[in-house]
């Protein structure tokens, strides 16, 4: 069991059935020090930005990240830059990016432009890899980061995605600590769906994650190779958690208690 105490953030993905405003309220009421924010370009307005900025500030919360920018083939999407602008206004430290762009060099170029846009607000653009994206593993993500030529672009590690793409904590040992401004955190069984079953992999990622300590992922080993006390976005996407705790504050409180228990000294 780990003994350190990093900054813990309630990930937006824990609350897919609630608005960003409700997620912030739940985080504040249940004692989380930080929160993640879901950005939906179809519903987010300038009024949303002002309201979220004020809610986060009034609650004394840290906005660890805003998500998600999903890169796709074609020209740059203005909504991606708008997401960064919204994140900057609410004080978000990082913006989460995934990619379905088939050409790695195009992903790298888009990341560079997004990172340049975020730099003025001292935000980090962080690339997350997953089996169901075109950045399918750690090695692909690192290659794209190198191609971007931008040291400010970060790497986001999700323990579930690392395990399901064949990675291990040892694979992270040689990565420059500055590449990882934060990480995600959850548990899961040691073995998941077969790599060929993409639908099942997505289902596990969205609905079957486990509380820290309830699975067999090498979480202690993972934290040992990540930067010391790296902030953690607790990404507990779980249908069981949602069904058990329909109230957002109760859900947030239960997840925080379980996560803190994992970090408590033995």
Pin down the residues of each PLM region.
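Histidine-acidic metal/acid-base catalytic patches
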Residues: 1-12, 16-31, 57, 86, ...
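Active-site-proximal loop/turn and secondary-structure-junction residues that shape catalytic pockets
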Residues: 14-16, 41-43, 69-72, 100-103, ...
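Active-site acidic/histidine proton-transfer and metal-coordination neighborhood
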Residues: 21, 71-155, 164
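Conserved beta-strand positions in the central sheet of alpha/beta enzyme cores
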Residues: 36, 65, 96, 126, ...
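Short, solvent-exposed loop/turn segments at secondary-structure boundaries
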Residues: 47, 75-78, 108, 166-168, ...
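Short, structured active-site "lid" loops
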Residues: 57-68
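Glycine-rich, proline-tolerant flexible connector loops at the mouths of alpha/beta enzymes
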Residues: 36-57
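The substrate-binding groove and active-site-proximal loops of carbohydrate-active enzymes
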Residues: 67-72, 209-213
């Amino acid at each position: 069991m780990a003994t350190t105490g990093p900054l813990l953030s309630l990930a937006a993905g824990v609350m897919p059935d609630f608005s960003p405003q409700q997620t912030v309220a739940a985080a504040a009421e249940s004692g989380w020090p930080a929160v993640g924010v879901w950005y939906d370009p179809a519903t987010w307005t300038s009024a949303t930005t002002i309201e979220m900025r004020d809610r986060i500030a009034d609650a004394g919360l840290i906005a660890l990240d805003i998500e998600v920018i999903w890169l796709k083939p074609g020209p740059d999407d203005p909504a991606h830059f708008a997401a960064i602008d919204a994140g900057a206004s609410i004080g978000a430290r990082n913006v989460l990016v995934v990619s379905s762009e088939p050409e790695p060099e195009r992903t790298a170029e888009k990341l560079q432009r997004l990172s340049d846009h975020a730099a003025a607000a001292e935000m980090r653009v962080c690339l997350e890899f997953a089996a169901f994206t075109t950045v399918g593993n750690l090695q692909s993500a690192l290659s794209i980061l190198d191609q971007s030529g931008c040291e400010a672009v970060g790497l986001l590690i999700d323990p579930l995605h690392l395990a399901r793409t064949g990675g291990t904590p040892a694979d992270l040992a040689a990565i420059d600590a500055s590449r990882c401004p934060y990480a995600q955190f959850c548990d899961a069984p040691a073995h998941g769906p077969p790599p060929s079953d993409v639908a099942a992999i997505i289902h596990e990622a969205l609905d079957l994650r486990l509380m820290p300590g309830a699975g067999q992922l090498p979480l202690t080993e993972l934290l040992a190779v990540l930067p010391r006390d790296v902030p953690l976005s607790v990404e507990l996407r779980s249908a069981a958690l949602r069904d058990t705790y329909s109230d957002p504050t109760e859900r947030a409180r239960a997840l925080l208690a379980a996560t803190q228990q994992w970090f408590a000294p033995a």
